[in-house]
């Protein structure tokens, strides 16, 4: 389980940015010792390869809640195909159990080095967000950067919470916009 293998250096990197690591966020959010990591069915019998997202379920004040949280310290929290599939699996499980799902977003969008597979995974996630709409409460917490294609997923949830001076949501960054427009406004 990834929670038990947390690297202290990764945590200190987040603290330097005035942010918590996803493991710390889980420990603060859930009732003590109630969180259980969840792996998609096809991962249970294989060596699980960590892909920058932790999924699971537990209780918050005794209420069952499902969860996914991005790890910015792993590849900038970017969405790879497996990363997206893991989030989709936890949302579908939350729908089966008729429980709310909380997602903590902290990443740089699609994992470009994976090419079209990463973007396809994001598209499948957006579709799953729409399937869950009106079925279960979907709550998004923007706990850092939420960039590029990844910004659409929280936009499809029921509630979005941001953190003053830490949260950023954008499709295209200021540097790219200024370059394309030939301006220096942003």
Region roles according to the model:
Residues 57-71, 86-113:
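A structural preference for short, pocket-lining loop segments at secondary-structure junctions
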Residues 4, 16-19, 31-35, 96, ...:
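Generic secondary-structure signature for well-ordered alpha-helical cores
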Residues 105-186:
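Conserved catalytic cores of soluble enzyme domains
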Residues 51-55, 64, 99-100, 126, ...:
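Short glycine-rich loop/turn motifs
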Residues 51-53, 86-89, 146:
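Short alpha-helical segments and helix-capping/turn motifs at coil-helix boundaries
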Residues 75-82, 114-119:
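Flexible beta-alpha connector loops of hexameric P-loop NTPases
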Residues 1-65, 69-76:
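Intrinsically disordered, low-complexity segments enriched in small/flexible residues
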């Amino acid at each position: 389980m990834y929670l038990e293998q947390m690297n202290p250096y990764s945590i200190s990197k987040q603290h330097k940015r005035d942010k918590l690591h996803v493991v710390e966020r889980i420990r603060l959010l859930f009732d003590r010792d109630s969180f259980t990591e969840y792996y998609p069915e096809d991962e249970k019998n294989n060596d699980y390869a960590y892909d920058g997202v932790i999924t699971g379920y537990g209780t918050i004040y005794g209420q069952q809640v499902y969860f996914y949280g991005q790890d910015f310290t792993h590849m900038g929290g970017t969405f790879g195909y497996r990363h997206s599939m893991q989030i989709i699996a936890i949302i579908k499980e939350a729908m089966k159990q008729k429980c709310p799902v909380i997602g903590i977003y902290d990443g740089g969008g699609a994992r470009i080095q994976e090419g079209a597979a990463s973007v396809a995974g994001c598209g499948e996630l957006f579709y799953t967000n729409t399937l869950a709409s009106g079925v279960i409460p979907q709550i998004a917490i923007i706990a850092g950067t939420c960039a590029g294609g990844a910004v659409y997923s929280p936009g499809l949830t029921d509630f979005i919470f941001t953190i003053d001076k830490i949260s950023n949501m954008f499709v295209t960054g200021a540097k790219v916009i200024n370059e394309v427009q030939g301006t220096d406004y942003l």
